[in-house]
């Protein structure tokens, strides 16, 4: 073979060697059965390390059973849900920190999963989440006393009600790590903070927007951007 015919293969080899991570982005969860959820040019990563930048930009791969997951990670494969550690006192915080694991839905022994019976474990998890919210917001776990007019001294703000509904949804539905999950950002009084953001997508920040204390978008503010924009200063917690 003449020297000029060797030049194109040699250049191709050098270009592939110069790319970070080789010819394929190393993405977790690109195994058999879930390959349809992986972007093009994505190879399976056996060591379970962090996804490469190219993989995060493509949206990431579906997480397999036993892999780490959370609110800000790629979804678990179909049929799996992102579950916090079994004896975790703050399950929501564990999911926000990415300390969950993809696994099959936990069903108590001897119970038909199709039957909608109340479960003691679910009630306990809801109580734990409620205590976690109250601890973070600085409110007391004791019920508020009613005044002479029959109205509680401390009423739940609109943002706090919204947050409770999100927590209830996470308890009752199969949680697969939705990329567009919105957890409202509340102040200690239960009202909305000015800056609200959706969950991140891989290594990219989720879209943000500005609202007033009751949750209504401020004039000129719309959902979008990379999450780096700031809201005007002022009242509303």
UniProtKB/Swiss-Prot annotation:
Species, as recorded: Bos taurus (Bovine)
GO cellular component: extracellular space
Any Gene Ontology biological process: regulation of insulin-like growth factor receptor signaling pathway
Modified how: O-glycosylated.
PANTHER family hit by this protein: INSULIN-LIKE GROWTH FACTOR BINDING PROTEIN, INSULIN-LIKE GROWTH FACTOR-BINDING PROTEIN 6
Region (Disordered): 101-158, 215-237
Pfam families hit by this protein: Thyroglobulin_1
Signal peptide: 1-25
Biased composition (Polar residues): 135-151
Residues of the Thyroglobulin type-1 domain: 156-231
Entry keyword annotation includes Cell wall biogenesis/degradation: no
Localisation: Secreted
Function per UniProt: IGF-binding proteins prolong the half-life of the IGFs and have been shown to either inhibit or stimulate the growth promoting effects of the IGFs on cell culture. They alter the interaction of IGFs with their cell surface receptors. Activates the MAPK signaling pathway and induces cell migration.
Regions annotated as coiled coil: none
Disulfide bonds: 27-30, 38-42, 55-61, 69-82, 76-102, 159-186, 197-208, 210-231
Organism placement in taxonomy: Eukaryota, Metazoa, Chordata, Craniata, Vertebrata
Protein known as: Insulin-like growth factor-binding protein 6
């Amino acid at each position: 073979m003449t020297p000029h015919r060797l030049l194109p293969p040699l250049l191709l080899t050098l270009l592939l060697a110069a790319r970070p991570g080789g010819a394929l982005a190393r993405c977790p969860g690109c195994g058999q059965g879930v390959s349809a959820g992986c972007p093009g040019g994505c190879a399976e990563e056996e060591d379970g390390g962090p996804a490469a930048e190219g993989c995060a930009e493509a949206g990431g791969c579906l997480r397999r059973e036993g892999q780490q997951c959370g609110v800000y990670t790629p979804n678990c494969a179909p049929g799996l849900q992102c579950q916090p550690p079994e004896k975790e006192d703050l399950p929501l915080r564990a999911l926000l920190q990415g300390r969950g694991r993809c696994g099959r839905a936990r069903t108590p022994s001897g119970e038909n999963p199709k039957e909608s019976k109340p479960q003691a474990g679910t009630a306990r998890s809801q109580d734990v989440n409620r205590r976690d919210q109250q601890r973070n917001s600085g409110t007391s776990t004791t019920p508020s006393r009613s005044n002479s007019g029959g109205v509680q001294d401390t009423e739940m703000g609109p943002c706090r009600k919204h947050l409770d509904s999100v927590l209830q949804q996470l308890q009752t539905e199969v949680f697969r790590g939705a990329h567009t999950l919105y957890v409202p950002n509340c102040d200690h009084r239960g009202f909305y903070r000015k800056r609200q953001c959706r969950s991140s997508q891989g290594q990219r920040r989720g879209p943000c927007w500005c609202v007033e204390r009751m949750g209504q978008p401020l004039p000129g503010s719309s959902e979008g951007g990379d999450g780096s924009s700031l809201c005007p200063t002022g009242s509303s917690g």
